[in-house]
Amino acid sequence: STPTEELNPSWHMYSRGYTLSDVFAENPDWFAMSYKSFCGLLQDHGTGAWYYWCIGLLYLTLFAGIGIATFRQPDNLQGKIRFVICTLLMVGELAASIVNSWLIESMAQGRYLLPCILIAGYLASTVPELFQKKIYRTLLSIAGILSVGYFGLVGIPLFF
């Protein structure tokens, strides 16, 4: 029987002497596919790019709102430091996902980025005045509706 590593060249690349850049040579769409699997399902080939652009823009806008609200608070050095540290943790999540692809398997790893949502939620909870703004609540609701709608219209039918 042929070992799994020989059947799939993207498995355990580090232990077989490949460099980190070889991961992206083996899977040049790694970032795009990881993002797609973060926002939806990797197996979904029918959803238009508009969904991923829209949800990405919403996430970035919501996160920027948290940052702006945090940095507008006077005399809140602790909050600003917390925001920077948490943002670095999110970057660390991405780095860990990349390293995982190198050490284990180079396929898209969007599921490993899900803790970023928890970190963003925590940061949002530190600026409760943000939720008093109708525009922020509306954008958050739209993101939620799109996500739940995707799950119901695409995710569930894909597996049944």
Question: Which functions belong to the PLM regions below?
Answer:
Residues L57-T61, L88-A96, C116, I142-G149, ...:
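Lipid-exposed faces of alpha-helical membrane segments in multi-pass integral membrane proteins
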Residues T70-L77, Y122-I142:
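Membrane-interface junctions at the ends of membrane-embedded or membrane-associated helices
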Residues T70-P74, L94-I104, L153-F160:
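Juxtamembrane "helix-exit" motif on the non-cytosolic side of transmembrane helices
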Residues N76-V99:
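Transmembrane alpha-helix segments characteristic
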Residues S106-P128:
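Hydrophobic/aromatic-rich transmembrane helices and adjacent perimembrane loops
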Residues L130-F160:
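Signature aromatic-anchored transmembrane alpha helix within multi-pass, membrane-resident enzymes
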